[in-house]
Swiss-Prot record:
It is an enzyme of class 1 (oxidoreductase). It catalyses: a quinone + sn-glycerol 3-phosphate = dihydroxyacetone phosphate + a quinol. InterPro entries: DAO_C (IPR031656), DAO_C_sf (IPR038299), FAD-dep_OxRdtase (IPR006076), FAD/NAD-bd_sf (IPR036188), G3P_DH_FAD-dep (IPR000447). Keywords: Cytoplasm, FAD, Flavoprotein, Glycerol metabolism, Oxidoreductase. It holds the Pfam family DAO_C. It is found in: Cytoplasm. Its cofactor is FAD. FAD binds at residues 24-52. This is Aerobic glycerol-3-phosphate dehydrogenase. GO terms for molecular function: glycerol-3-phosphate dehydrogenase (quinone) activity. The gene is glpD. Induction: Requires glycerol 3-phosphate and the GlpP product; repressed by glucose. GO terms for cellular component: cytoplasm.
């Protein structure tokens, strides 16, 4: 049953095997850009390996606004080309993984004296529809003030003139990343998490490999490759320093936080994109019985590994909520969870964080190290295509075979083999029935079918196999089934991997995490044969994340 190529129980073997081959491409960084590049390259026939020093998607790729969006706000900066490319790309991302990405109608209210008026909103959304190639059923409509309040009664009534209504796509960024990575594994890619590149290896001034440290065991491995890509997001400049090539352009990190509230406190029924008092734009989005709101955009110069919410960040978002939804009187005590993430933007002199372009660029150093900088979640597939085209051309120049064009445009990602978006609901309905037949509640069966898509049978098989063990441990069987699946087929190596990135529960169901964490940690501890010290360390790490999700940095 185990997928040997992507089980965290196989990490040692995988790392040892890597030292015995020379790869066409070695990718440093296991976020969405690295995962997309691995899938593109492996599906063209390249031999690909990848290392990620934390967990997959642990950096920016699990901390976004969780929208595959068309970039409406970039029209304000007249970034027409970006809106056109990203908008079209959005539909492709959706079709290839409809279980992780879903259309979400967005309300854009406009008030007297706000950033957008009726005319600019209408024109802006029309241009957006045109540039982004929006399909007919999802084209924007304009609403009166009365219609706007029917869509969302909580919106500020004072000065309300109307609203725009258009489609965004909501996603689970971390699961999108892991599903892309799993599809890359199917094509033969070899990704390993918790493996840090300590240094680059050179021959005659050219980068020919990496020295990797397994962060969990402290063992070291030398791995060789014809081409090396730096897809480390916020860390790209650190790797360029190792390569002595950090000159010219560099990154500017900005931080964005999101707050999560229970629907009982913030009963939003409709996603809203709205003005803040200082002229920025913020999203409020209902999701799984919660409402989440963000984001901020502030220059960040602290440690990159664990950005935290500050009191100032928190208060800014709360003030924005109470400005647009004045009847709620939200306070800091209402916050159930939060997250903070970094945008790895390409520095532009004299620009405010919100004005800096989100475009991506590829830089090649004298040693041949290829760096991908900037970019957006939505554009990951296109970015990967550009990188792999460059790698293909360089390899061809050096006498290697031609690996041909990109194949990912109509390629479902792992879990996405459900017959396209039009068949998703019938697929989920059928699988929900199977889950109920296996003894699960309708709610749990449906949630599993949506989360795992066409891989859900692998989870259902484990529901059958783990019934006795679940009863013995006094934990619902589907939780053990998910945990085992994520260890054996999604390279989950720590409790945080499972609770934060494989299930998103630390953000969207934090009390569930508090309820089941000890039982899941016990289960994982036996699977990984952790000693007491290791088990305590993993427990402490998870408890710290639970604390940081609610308590700002200064408290």
């Amino acid at each position: 049953m185990m997928n040997h190529q992507f089980s965290s129980l196989e990490r040692d073997r995988m790392l040892t095997d890597m030292t015995k081959k020379t790869y066409d491409l070695f990718i440093i960084g296991g976020g969405i850009t690295g995962a997309g590049t691995a899938l593109d390259a492996a599906s063209r026939g390249m031999k690909v390996a990848l290392s990620e020093m934390q967990d997959f998607a642990a950096g920016t790729s699990s901390r976004s606004t969780k929208l595959v969006h068309g970039g409406l706000r970039y029209l304000k900066q007249f970034e027409v080309k970006m809106v056109a490319e990203v908008g079209k790309e959005r539909a492709i991302v959706y079709e290839n993984g409809p279980h992780v990405t879903t259309p979400e109608w967005m309300l854009l209210p406009f008030h007297k004296g706000g950033t957008f008026g009726s005319f600019t909103t209408s024109i802006g959304l029309r241009v957006y529809d045109f540039l982004a190639g929006v399909k007919k059923s999802e084209r924007r409509s304009m609403l009166s003030a009365k219609e706007t309040l029917q869509k969302e009664p909580l919106v500020k009534k004072d000065g309300l003139k109307g609203g725009g209504y258009y489609v965004e796509y909501r996603t689970d960024d971390a699961r999108l990343t892991i599903e892309v990575m799993k599809e890359a594994v199917k094509f033969g890619a070899e990704p390993v998490n918790y493996s840090k590149v300590k240094e680059l290896l050179y021959e005659k001034g050219k980068a020919v490999g990496v020295l990797i440290e397994d962060v969990l065991t402290k063992k070291e491995y030398k791995v060789y490759a014809k081409k090396i890509v730096n897809a480390t997001g916020p860390w790209v400049d650190q790797l360029r320093e190792k390569d002595h090539s950090k000159n010219g352009k560099h990154l500017q990190h900005t931080k964005g936080i999101h707050l999560v509230f229970d629907q009982s406190v913030f009963p939003l029924k409709q996603a809203v994109y709205f003005d803040t008092p200082d002229g920025r734009m913020v999203f409020a989005i209902p999701r799984e019985g919660k409402t989440y709101v963000g984001t901020t955009d502030t220059v960040y110069k602290e440690a990159l590994e664990h950005p935290r919410m500050t009191t100032e960040d928190r208060d800014y978002v709360i003030k924005s909520i109470n400005y647009m939804f004045p009847e709620l009187n939200i306070t800091a005590n209402d916050i159930e969870s939060s997250w903070a993430g970094l945008r790895p933007l390409i520095h532009e002199e004299g620009k405010d964080p919100s004005e800096i372009s989100r475009k991506d660029e590829i830089w090649t150093s004298d040693s041949g190290l290829i760096t991908i900088a900037g970019g957006k979640l939505t554009g990951y597939r296109k970015m990967a295509e550009h990188i792999v085209d460059l790698v293909r051309d360089r390899l061809k120049e050096e006498g290697e075979k031609d690996f041909g064009p990109c194949k990912t445009k109509n390629m479902p990602i792992s879990g996405g083999h459900v017959g396209g978006s039009k068949n998703l609901m019938s697929f989920v309905t059928a699988k929900t029935k199977e889950g109920i037949a296996a003894g699960l509640s309708e709610k749990d069966a449906k949630q599993l079918a949506i989360r795992y898509g066409s891989n859900v049978d692998r989870v259902f098989d484990r529901v059958e196999a783990l019934k006795d063990e679940a009863a013995k441990r006094n934990i619902p069987v589907h939780i053990l089934a998910e945990a085992e699946y994520s260890i054996e087929e999604e390279m989950t190596a720590t409790p945080a991997d499972f609770f934060v990135r494989r299930t998103g529960r630390l953000f969207f169901d934090i009390n569930w995490v508090r309820t089941y964490k000890d039982a899941v940690i016990d289960f994982m501890s036996e699977r990984f044969q952790w000693d007491e010290q290791a088990k305590n360390k993993h427990t402490e790490n998870l408890n710290k994340l639970l604390h940081d999700a609610v308590v700002p940095l200064e408290q």
